[in-house]
UniProtKB/Swiss-Prot annotation:
Species of provenance: Acidobacterium capsulatum (strain ATCC 51196 / DSM 11244 / BCRC 80197 / JCM 7670 / NBRC 15755 / NCIMB 13165 / 161)
Key words of the record: Cell cycle, Cell division, Cell shape, Cell wall biogenesis/degradation, Cytoplasm, Peptidoglycan synthesis, Pyruvate, Transferase
Function: Cell wall formation. Adds enolpyruvyl to UDP-N-acetylglucosamine.
Main subcellular location of this protein, as a coarse class: cytoplasm
Originating gene: murA
Positions annotated to bind phosphoenolpyruvate: K22, N23
Protein's name according to its UniProt entry: UDP-N-acetylglucosamine 1-carboxyvinyltransferase
Taxonomic lineage: Bacteria, Pseudomonadati, Acidobacteriota, Terriglobia, Terriglobales
Alphabetical list of CDD domains matching this protein: UdpNAET
Record-listed UDP-N-acetyl-alpha-D-glucosamine binding positions: R96, R125, P126, I127, D128, L129, D309, I331
Amino acid sequence: MDKFVIRGGNPLIGTVRVSGAKNSALPCMAAAILTEDEVILENIPQVRDIETERKLLTSMGAEVELGYGRAQHRTTISCRVLSDPTAKYEIVKTMRASALVLGPLVARTGLARVSMPGGCAIGARPIDLHIKGLEQMGATIVYEHGYIEARAERLKGAQIHFDKITVTGTEDLMMAAVLAEGETVLENAAREPEVTDLAALLTAMGAQIEGAGTSEIRIQGVEKLHGARHRINPDRIEAGTFLIAGAITGGDLCVSHCNPAHLGAVIAKLEEAGVRIDVLGKDSLRVRSEGHLKPIDVSTEEYPGFPTDMQAQYMALATQAEGTTLVKENIFENRFMHVQELVRMGANIKTAGRIASVRGKTPLSAAAVMCSDLRASASLVLAALVANGESILDRVYNIDRGYEHIEEKLRGVGAQIKRLGNVFNDKREAAQISAS
């Protein structure tokens, strides 16, 4: 099992490039199910979840080509033949986004069998909002042997109100609705950039969608969709993670190939904390910090508020602020699993329910820590970058689910970080980073 060895203390200086958004790419790959034609997606990140989605689609009979190169990360998907509309447990057990094939499958084939999804263990992300919406559209749902089976001759348009804002639920039902008979209205819909990115692809495929990016989305169903070419949005969470990496290390970092418009809440909090951020053109940000950080409270919200996927990283930064920072998690319960690992590194953090109190400025010391989920893992990387000594991060496959070659990107801007695989016990490997 791979590990990271990180020696802290180096300011990050230089330019780091942001990859395509995993959380945009996954629903866009699922959208290829809706047509017999080829769908070409560009700016696909090279991360573990994308490979899992490829396996999922090919297990259904699709043809999926993934190509990675310096200039272009691209996938070509053909779902002309879907021989088995089943999302098998052995594939989807590691990825929550597998639920996104439910809507497209029942819309295109009239049948979907999807195992209850897996992914990060950060609280309840109920699929019941997907199910309720599909039932309103006329689908018959059966739960059997750990699978959700949905059937419908053709889905019917419906007015669907989400009791709770759900990104994957909005995406799943938007995909289901594009081939439904009549108009579907999604109320209290998610407004995230990943939703608008999916809507842009679906529109390019011939769908009729209005209001994506607002709380009410209207979809007029069509008989058939065609193929399209689409470029995936930059990953706003990866970009935000690098902004904090520059700030926490007291560096001077340019974060390129991002979309500053998608980072408003993150930028605002960092600037309040005393971090200097400059917009360089339409797709780059420069972050500078001299290490004097103010304690600024944060409360996670749905977009355009402060993203829950940046909460753990912000908490790592808060350990270096001069005072007490309150962090409130409003989206998911049980999303403080990184706290105990940060405490192992010397952080002074106390939790009560959904609120964490972070007292700084705390000198962090290197430790062996466990990566529990994707964003918690990112927070540990950030903490290790400023910790005194050499930290060892175990189970970094959680990082690989959503960050493309993060160790190579960080090493390129001055971090002392090395990936160790099964040869971890070889002292010569560990010594390489100690001597660098």
